[in-house]
């Protein structure tokens, strides 16, 4: 795997795109069985269409690797917590009267298709052109229908995506709900700031944003993350988090939002597990994600 560059691109089977497919595979696993933790019936056909066989075997339960991060309980619960958090964010925003939603770096996210959006909601999705084209085409072939006003936009978030958003009819004068899920570590530090500056510029008072805070994103290149990458390689998947993320000091998202006109609330990884009725995560999962917080901001 090659290290990231400022002009790199990907599809759902390569680089950062493959991590989105891995997350979709985890959602597919968590959506199975009588005690399913999620209800994402579109994740599995997307993963199968991408065709990365290690991830197809993962959703089929045909993996023999048994280090702690691959534990079905810990992995499925972590994905369920994360997915439910952002699902609930959009549901609450819609119930509160917001009628514009923007999913940044949407990957194989299926919320435009599976959430019960209120009447009049416009849902925008932004991601790499190859990712957007693959997902919309595959789900159309599968017979899945998005919400009535679904506007996917194929553009790199390092480019002038605000102009592309406006060109598709986005109204900066109306409150908007934004999510940046599983995104920030894949942006250079300065691009993270620019992302939130653009969101702020496009957000009227009452708009909301949800994202994640990692106190030390560089921890993804530590020994435990290296063991996780080794596990993926044994599965046949050439993914190395140390090569995919951007390193270096970056502003703390909680403080940055608070300093730029947002009222911020953060809930810890452990708190959200308890909120969803799960036992505390195991030690290996805590080592990777334990310092993480789920963050919501409301524009003042």
Curated annotation (Swiss-Prot):
Disulfide bonds: none
GO biological process: methylation
Coiled-coil stretches: none
Positions annotated to bind S-adenosyl-L-methionine: 127, 156-157
One Gene Ontology MF term: methyltransferase activity
Root EC class: transferase
Stored InterPro entries: Ppm1/Ppm2/Tcmp, SAM-dependent_MTases_sf, SAM_mthyl_Trfase_ML2640-like
EC number of this enzyme: 2.1.1.-
Keywords attached to this entry: Methyltransferase, S-adenosyl-L-methionine, Transferase
SUPFAM superfamilies cross-referenced by the UniProt entry: S-adenosyl-L-methionine-dependent methyltransferases (SSF53335)
Annotated Pfam families: LCM (PF04072)
Residue stretches spanning the membrane: none
Family: Belongs to the UPF0677 family.
Task performed by this protein: Exhibits S-adenosyl-L-methionine-dependent methyltransferase activity.
Listed NCBIfam families: mthyl_TIGR00027
Name under which the protein is recorded: Putative S-adenosyl-L-methionine-dependent methyltransferase MMAR_1058
Classification lineage: Bacteria, Bacillati, Actinomycetota, Actinomycetes, Mycobacteriales
